[in-house]
Amino acid sequence: MTSREGRAPLARRAVVYGVVGLAAIAGVAMWSGAGWHRATGASGESPEASVAGGSVTAPPQAAVPASTGLPPSLAGSSAPRLPLDAGGHLAKSRAVRDFFDYCLTAQSDLSAAGLDAFVMREIAAQLDGTVAQAEALDVWHRYRAYLDALAKLRDAGAADKSDLGALQLALDQRASIAYRTLGDWSQPFFGAEQWRQRYDLARLKIAQDPTLTDAQKAERLAALEQQMPADERAAQQHIDQQRAAIDQIAQLQKSGATPDAMRAQLTQTLGPEAAARVAQMQQDDASWQSRYADYAAQRTQIESAGLSPQDRDAQIAALRQRVFTRPGEAVRAASLDRGAGSAR
């Protein structure tokens, strides 16, 4: 196993999950490929959190157990809840996209027809016999049409971030495709993300305008920030806090600070609770690295045993389930296995 295999940068994960909390950093997301595929295992709401933002989640008892018939990449996970409005219809919410993105995580394991069948089963597990079931299937077909159209763009609609004209074109193309394929679902699926992307692009245009002085740039950036809705401004503050914390943690790691020294310094700037979470993540990270290294060694033995592809994959999947028993761990290991396989 390489030094990078089995891990994401601790500094970034500590901030995103342990220090500041999740924030929607969408400014870079649009330039990637056809879709965001959600890490699973802890993504669903608890049954108690059944009412949010005027919608209700589908009844918890309708869900299929996570271990039943899931593709290998989703083993040990469960689908996010599909939200319903007060009338029992599918609520127009970003949570619906999250559900489909969860299902799309399995696309490397399934054919196109197999993926459609899997999504139909997951929808039925929550909405069988309801009016929302047909609505969810219709939205799925719309979302697939969006992703298919996006994939036909040059480089799947990705753009060189140094070319502001290309960025603007990519953004406009994606927005047009979303509206054409998703209709009134384009706003709940991508509205907030597209607003953030346009805001970030406007900032880039100001920052890179050679006709402006530094003072003029600062003035225009401040004026642009004032146009932000209050919730977006709060999100931007979270992003700024994240970046500062990431830089601090990375610098402490680079300097070789001991866990106690890192915790002491982070306590001063982030507070004792956040510092304690970072320390716990360090311990969890070390434990994960050790277990993944042991697992990777056993996986290599299986791969070298001359088994048929079917038997090999079955044994590796069984090994993952034995070694990684916490929610989401087997999914993470499977994802890392695919990355390691493509690198070999």
From Swiss-Prot:
Described function: May be involved in the folding of the extracellular lipase during its passage through the periplasm.
Source organism, top-level taxon: Bacteria
A molecular function (GO) term: unfolded protein binding
Family annotation (Pfam families): Lipase_chap
Region feature (Disordered): 39-78
Keywords: Cell inner membrane, Cell membrane, Chaperone, Lipid degradation, Lipid metabolism, Membrane, Transmembrane, Transmembrane helix
Location within or outside the cell: Cell inner membrane
Gene Ontology CC terms: plasma membrane
Species of provenance: Pseudomonas sp. (strain KWI-56)
Tagged with keyword Membrane: yes
TM annotation in the entry: 14-34
GO biological process, one term: lipid catabolic process
Family, similarity comment: Belongs to the lipase chaperone family.
Gene for this chain: lifO
Location (main, coarse): membrane
Protein name: Lipase chaperone
